[in-house]
Amino acid sequence: MRYEDIADVPAPMQDDMPTILQNIREKLIAGVEKRLDADAPVGFLLSGGLDSSLVCSIAAKKLGKPIRTFAIGMDTDAIDLKYARQTADYLGSEHHEIIINREMVLSSLEEVIRLLGTWDITTIRASMGMYLLCKAIHEQTDVRVLLTGEISDELFGYKYTDYAPTADAFQQESQKRIRELYMYDVLRADRCISSNSIEARVPFGDLDFVRYVMAIDPEKKLNRYGKGKYLLRKAFEGDWLPPEILWREKAAFSDAVGHSMVDDIKEYAESLYTDEEFQMRRANYSAHCMPFTKAVSYTHLT
């Protein structure tokens, strides 16, 4: 039984642009601030992307002291580490970097699949970095509460929603993503963080913030500005973040892992069985959930 559908908007509200930007800023600040109160040490996941960087920036301003930030990357092509480091330097945080390699990823793969309880290969791949980072945080520090930047994409749009043909199509996709949160990004954050005995807190999921952003006229959320998530970026212009971080586009595979980890998982799955064995496994499925690659087939076996 659903007690509330936060994706449901009876009618879009008609605030003007200055009011929208002010409310986005004030409501997200409030969402971060109320999640800073804890009876255990608090840390922050920092990928170097817009969303986690904003959470860290707000927290640093509110606390008035260096916050503890954590980033992760592969030893070969850590796409986001340099951006996380740039943000940390700007905020003056106590920054920690965890470097992982192919062996660490593959040795944890079955455990992550078990924890997630999903066959979705994208969610599994995106979870590897977060799981290993939280594992390191638990083992190496006393941090037991982590603030993250999840749910911003569902509210303000993914890269592909930049090409939404109409405002209605954008809103429908956003509503679908919000209603399916428990299946993907929130599943990833909840399982990867809590399995390492750490509490996750998600300011972008603040109900007041979500209700407001979902009620913004979708015409204003469409990418008519040459930049995705324009409203969120514009709301935090000023001294919140370096401009190159605030206006940076989201990178492909930017789960702090890079292309090398994706390739490592594919190569590992390819080594497990031949093309003939893969086709035999596919034949055991109906059209529903039929694995389309060896990597996907591997997740079904785990």
Give, region by region, the residue ranges found by the protein language model.
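Non-catalytic substrate-recognition/targeting regions of SAM-dependent transferases
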Residues: M1-D5
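ATP-dependent adenylate-handling active sites, centered on carboxylate activation for C-N bond formation
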Residues: I6-W240, F253-E270, F278-M290
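Conserved S-adenosyl-L-methionine
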Residues: E244-R248
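Long, low-complexity C-terminal extensions of enzymes
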Residues: P291-S297
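Conserved small/polar residues in nucleotide/adenosyl-binding loops
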Residues: T299-T302
